[in-house]
């Protein structure tokens, strides 16, 4: 059966593994999910990710990051633009998450960017998710 919203599934698996203090989470691979994982790694929300060959297709293994006393690096994840209600933002009206403490992941014509990168490049796009 096909999945309606693979990005929401990706974020939900991360949220569930994070709240259960798992060290890593395995999920179906796609280039979009790998790009989101790259942004999360660059911003310091996850420690690493890798692609593995599974029996069918590929898998994306994301290693979660915790502080010295097991405090979570990811406090929250929220899907913004959904298949039933797409959310777009102009370059002049990009969202700020928690006053700049969090990050908005935006799909632009230049690829996936954070809100700060999109503002710097002067491009808008579809607001995929908020991470804080």
Curated annotation (Swiss-Prot):
Keyword presence, Coiled coil: no
Key words, A-Z: Ribonucleoprotein, Ribosomal protein, RNA-binding, rRNA-binding
Classification via Pfam families: Ribosomal_S8
GO CC terms in record: ribonucleoprotein complex; ribosome
Entry superkingdom: Bacteria
GO biological process per UniProt: translation
GO molecular function per UniProt: rRNA binding; structural constituent of ribosome
Family note: Belongs to the universal ribosomal protein uS8 family.
HAMAP family: Ribosomal_uS8_B (MF_01302_B)
Function according to Swiss-Prot or TrEMBL: One of the primary rRNA binding proteins, it binds directly to 16S rRNA central domain where it helps coordinate assembly of the platform of the 30S subunit.
Quaternary structure, from the entry: Part of the 30S ribosomal subunit. Contacts proteins S5 and S12.
Name of the featured protein: Small ribosomal subunit protein uS8
Taxonomic source organism: Mycolicibacterium smegmatis (strain ATCC 700084 / mc(2)155) (Mycobacterium smegmatis)
GN (gene name): rpsH
């Amino acid at each position: 059966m096909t999945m309606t919203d693979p990005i929401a599934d990706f974020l939900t698996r991360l949220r569930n593994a994070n709240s259960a203090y798992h060290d890593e989470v395995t999920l179906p691979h796609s280039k979009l999910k790998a790009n989101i994982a790259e942004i999360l790694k660059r911003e310091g929300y996850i420690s690493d990710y890798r692609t593995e060959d599974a029996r069918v297709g590929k898998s994306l293994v994301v290693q979660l990051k915790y502080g010295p006393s097991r405090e979570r690096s990811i406090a929250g994840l929220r899907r913004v633009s959904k298949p039933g209600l797409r959310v777009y933002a102009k370059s002049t009206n990009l969202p700020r998450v928690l006053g700049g403490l969090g990050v908005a992941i935006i799909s632009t014509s230049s690829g996936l960017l954070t809100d700060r990168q999109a503002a710097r490049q002067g491009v808008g796009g579809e607001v995929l998710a908020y991470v804080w």
